[in-house]
C-alpha cells in the first residue's frame, strides 16, 4: 500500500461485481499499485513520462482507473497541470466524474499517496499484471476457437494461437525499448569496438562468408541484419545460400538454422555432401559412385557428425510466427545461432493477409527483420525476381526487380543478386563465373564481386581469375 489509510473502492465495472466471476477466479491485478500510480501523478506531474513509457490506459484493471489515467493524459497533452481540481473538472466535462467515484475518491487518491518516489515500480506492477491478464484472455480466445473453429483447420488454429501469444510478447518488448542515454549507447559501442579490436585483423566483423572478396565488401554477414539473396531461376541462389550456411557451420561455434520451404531435407543434404566433398551431385543423386567418391563423402559425413552444427526444417508454407518460435527454440537450446537461412521468402504465408499479397509480403519481410534484430543473428532470405528483367538487353538485376520489392528493399540491410552471363549467352566469355551484385548495403559499399561457379559440385568458390572492376 502507498499509505497507511485504506482506499475506498470506487464504482467498478461488471467484471468486478459479477459474483460468478468472483466465485471462480479473479484476474491478477493490484488495486493498490494502480491507486499509487494515479495518486503519484497528481503529486508530481513531472513523473508522467516515466509512467507513460511503462503503461497505457488499458493496463489498468478497473474502468474508473482507466478513465482517470486517460483524462490525465489529456491534461498532460494540453499543458494543463494534473491535480485534484483540474482532474475533477476535466472528468466532469466528460460526464465521468461520478462513475470514477466522484471528487471524494480523487481526493483519497491524492491524500493517501504520500510520495511519488516509487511510482515507476508501481507502474511496473500494473504493467506486469496487465500482461498476465492478456495471456489469460488469449488463452480463453484460443480455447473458444478450438471449441468453435468456424471452418478453420488445426494448422490455422495453431497459427492463430501462436500469433496472438506472439503479439503479447511483441507488445511487451516494445514497452521495454525506447530512448537510451548517449552514455549507455557509447558504453556499448566502445565495448563492441574493443571486442572487434581483440579479433584477428582480417576485416571480418560478422559471420565469415567463406569468400575473400565478398568479405572485403561486407566485412561478413552482420548480426541483426536481414540479408536478401535474389536471382532468376537457374542462377544458383539456393546453392549460394547453402554455401554461406556450410561455411558458417564449419567456421562458427553456434549452429546454423535452415528453413527449406521448397526442397526436402534429403535433397538439401545431397547438395551439401556434393559441395563439401566435391563430388558430382548427379552421381550422388543417382548412386553411381566409385570408391574415391565414397571416401570423400565418408570424410565429409564424419566432419558434419562431429560438428553437429546445423538444423534443417523442411516444413512447407511456414508463417512468420512459426519461423520465429522454431528459431527461438533452437536459439535457447544452444545459447545462440550463427545464421538463419530461409529458402525462399515468397513461400512463407500469413493466413490473415492471404487476400492481399503486397501486405502479406510486407508482413513477412518485417517479421524476418524483427527476428534478426531480436536474436542478434543474420537472417538470409532468398527472394524471387520479376520476369520483366528478361525483356532488358542487360539482364543484371537491380533492386526494383525484386518481386513485391517495396517492403523487401526497405527492410533489407544487404541485398545480393546473383548473375551468370552464361545462362543467357551460351558462348559467353564469362563461363563458370558468377557475379554477386550488391544492390544495397546499409552500412557499406555497393558493387560487384566475382565467384567461380562449379555447378557439378553445387558450389561457388573464390574467384582466382584476372582483375575486374568491382564498382
UniProtKB/Swiss-Prot annotation:
GO terms for cellular component: cytosol; primosome complex. PROSITE patterns: SF4_HELICASE. Residues 200-467 form the SF4 helicase domain. GO terms for molecular function: ATP binding; ATP hydrolysis activity; DNA binding; DNA helicase activity. Its EC number is 5.6.2.3. It holds the Pfam family DnaB. GO terms for biological process: DNA replication; DNA replication, synthesis of primer. It catalyses: Couples ATP hydrolysis with the unwinding of duplex DNA at the replication fork by translocating in the 5'-3' direction. This creates two antiparallel DNA single strands (ssDNA). The leading ssDNA polymer is the template for DNA polymerase III holoenzyme which synthesizes a continuous strand; ATP + H2O = ADP + phosphate + H(+). Belongs to the helicase family. DnaB subfamily. The main replicative DNA helicase, it participates in initiation and elongation during chromosome replication. Travels ahead of the DNA replisome, separating dsDNA into templates for DNA synthesis. A processive ATP-dependent 5'-3' DNA helicase it has DNA-dependent ATPase activity. Homohexamer. NCBIfam families: DnaB, PRK05748.1, PRK08006.1, PRK08840.1. This is Replicative DNA helicase DnaB. It comes from Salmonella typhimurium (strain LT2 / SGSC1412 / ATCC 700720).
Amino acid at each position: 500500500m502507498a499509505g497507511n489509510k485504506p482506499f475506498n473502492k470506487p464504482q467498478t465495472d461488471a467484471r468486478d461485481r459479477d459474483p460468478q466471476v468472483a466465485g471462480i477466479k479473479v484476474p491478477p491485478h493490484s488495486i493498490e499499485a494502480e491507486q499509487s500510480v494515479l495518486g503519484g501523478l497528481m503529486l508530481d506531474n513531472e513523473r508522467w513520462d516515466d509512467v507513460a513509457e511503462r503503461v497505457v490506459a488499458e493496463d489498468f484493471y478497473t474502468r474508473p482507473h482507466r478513465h482517470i489515467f486517460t483524462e490525465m493524459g489529456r491534461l498532460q497533452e494540453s499543458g494543463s497541470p494534473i491535480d485534484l481540481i483540474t482532474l475533477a473538472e476535466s472528468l466532469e466535462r466528460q460526464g465521468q466524474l461520478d462513475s470514477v467515484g466522484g471528487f471524494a475518491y480523487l481526493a483519497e487518491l491524492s491524500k493517501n499517496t504520500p510520495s511519488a518516489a516509487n511510482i515507476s515500480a508501481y507502474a511496473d506492477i500494473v504493467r506486469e499484471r496487465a500482461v498476465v491478464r492478456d495471456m489469460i484472455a488469449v488463452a480463453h480466445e484460443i480455447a473458444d476457437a478450438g471449441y468453435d473453429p468456424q471452418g478453420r483447420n488445426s494448422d490455422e488454429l495453431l497459427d492463430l494461437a501462436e500469433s496472438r501469444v506472439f503479439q503479447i510478447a511483441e507488445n511487451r518488448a516494445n514497452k521495454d525499448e525506447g530512448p537510451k542515454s548517449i552514455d549507455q549507447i557509447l558504453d556499448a559501442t566502445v565495448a563492441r569496438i574493443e571486442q572487434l579490436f581483440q579479433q584477428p585483423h582480417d576485416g571480418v566483423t560478422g559471420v565469415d562468408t567463406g569468400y575473400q572478396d565478398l568479405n572485403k565488401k561486407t566485412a561478413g554477414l552482420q548480426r541483426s541484419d536481414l540479408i536478401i539473396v535474389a536471382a532468376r531461376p537457374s542462377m544458383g541462389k539456393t546453392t549460394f545460400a547453402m554455401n554461406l550456411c556450410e561455411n558458417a557451420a564449419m567456421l562458427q561455434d553456434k549452429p546454423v538454422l535452415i528453413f527449406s520451404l521448397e526442397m526436402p531435407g534429403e535433397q538439401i543434404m545431397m547438395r551439401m555432401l556434393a559441395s563439401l566433398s566435391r563430388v558430382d551431385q548427379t552421381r550422388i543423386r543417382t548412386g553411381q559412385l566409385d570408391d574415391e567418391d565414397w571416401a570423400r563423402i565418408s570424410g565429409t559425413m564424419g566432419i558434419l557428425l562431429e560438428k553437429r552444427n546445423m538444423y534443417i526444417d523442411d516444413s512447407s508454407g511456414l508463417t512468420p510466427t512459426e519461423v520465429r518460435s522454431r528459431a527461438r527454440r533452437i536459439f535457447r537450446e544452444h545459447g545462440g545461432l550463427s545464421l538463419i537461412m530461409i529458402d525462399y521468402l515468397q513461400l512463407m504465408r500469413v493466413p490473415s493477409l492471404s487476400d492481399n499479397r503486397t501486405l502479406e509480403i510486407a508482413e513477412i519481410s518485417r517479421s524476418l527483420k524483427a527476428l534478426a534484430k531480436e536474436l542478434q543473428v543474420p537472417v538470409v532470405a532468398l527472394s524471387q525476381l520479376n520476369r520483366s528483367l528478361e525483356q532488358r538487353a542487360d539482364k543484371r538485376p537491380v533492386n526494383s526487380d525484386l518481386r513485391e520489392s517495396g517492403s523487401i528493399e526497405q527492410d533489407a540491410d544487404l541485398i545480393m543478386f546473383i548473375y551468370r552471363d552464361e545462362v543467357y549467352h551460351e558462348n559467353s566469355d564469362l563461363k563458370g563465373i558468377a557475379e554477386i551484385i550488391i544492390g544495397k548495403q546499409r552500412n557499406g559499399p555497393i558493387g560487384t564481386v566475382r565467384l567461380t561457379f562449379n555447378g557439378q559440385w553445387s558450389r561457388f568458390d573464390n574467384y582466382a581469375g584476372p582483375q575486374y572492376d568491382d564498382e
